[in-house]
Amino acid sequence: MAFQTSCAAAGGINCPPDIVADGEGRELVQHGSALFPIACYAEDVKSYSVAWHWHEEFEFIFAVKGPLTVDVNKTQLVLRTGQGVFINSGVLHAVEQAESGNALLHSGVFHPRLVGGMDTIFWQKRIRPLLQPGAPAFFLLDSGTAWQREALACLQDAWQAVADEPPDYENEARYRLTTVLRLLGAQCEEGGGVKVSQQEQIAAERMKQMLRFVEEHYAEELTVERIAACVALSESACLRSFRQLLGITPIQYVKQFRVEKAAELLRSTRLRTGEIGAECGFTDGSYFIKTFRELKHCTPKEYRQRFEAQ
């Protein structure tokens, strides 16, 4: 979730939205419209992160100025300038700045039906291969390989078309994205991309259930035991699952989730800091401020002031 963003918005480009997720961590933000289900984002990053989430849409991220860290399931990617990643539908992922300094990213989130509905040849030939069981979770894109270079160029062209909105830009963006899906589909046939094993898929689905439990109970006292019990795991197995998939402990995730909820309330309400902390599961006001500062690099009061000053 972006904090104190400096958004390079123009034309059809948006500032990245705050991640609003349902109980399984699935993002609920609508990207684009029902008629044209794509949205493109630009972000000049100072202190930037996108919490763990997933959505039905495909997503591409391009590092205009790196480095950026993109976590996809159990894999951590560092995107250098000029590199990109295409993330498949339904895959857990998160984004953060890799090093101190500024990073600029361009990203796009689009629903598969932008290319064609399920009853079209476009779905059967271009989309279905990517949605099959065992399909790659993501494709790392680098200009050093011919097909990846073409894919990156098409993604940037699609992004720019949505940004500038020239005549017939919808068709241009759709054409470029269809080309990308053709390239990715060919890689699926050749065994390319980073695939997810059945065991990893089971672990990811179990993680979604645990994220849902945190979403539903974050205002209550939460322990590793309670989180583990929601999927019939032992505490040690729960800890191992979080560390392997998210790189953090369950309680660290709970803290991050509570802070993001608190940040949302600081932006959208006039509740006092203490009230917000209590609503988000922090029983001690001083601990809330300390935890918020650790994760957001400012106090809740400063966060609200900076948001209001934008």
What is the predicted function of each stretch?
Residues M1-G84, G90-V91, Q124-K125, A135-F139, ...:
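Generic protein-terminus/edge-of-domain signal
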Residues Y48-W54, E96-A98, M118-D119, Y169, ...:
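Short histidine-centered beta-strand/loop micro-motifs
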Residues G90-R113, T120-F122:
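Ligand-binding loop in jelly-roll beta-barrel domains
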Residues I121-R176, R212:
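Amphipathic alpha-helical segments enriched in hydrophobic/aromatic residues interleaved with Lys/Arg
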Residues E165-E172, G191-E200:
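Hydrophobic/aromatic-rich alpha-helical bundle segments in the mid-to-C-terminal region
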Residues E170-G191:
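Hydrophobic, aromatic-enriched interface-forming segments
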Residues L183-E190, Q209-E260, R267, L271, ...:
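Basic/polar phosphate-binding segments, predominantly the helix-turn-helix DNA-binding elements
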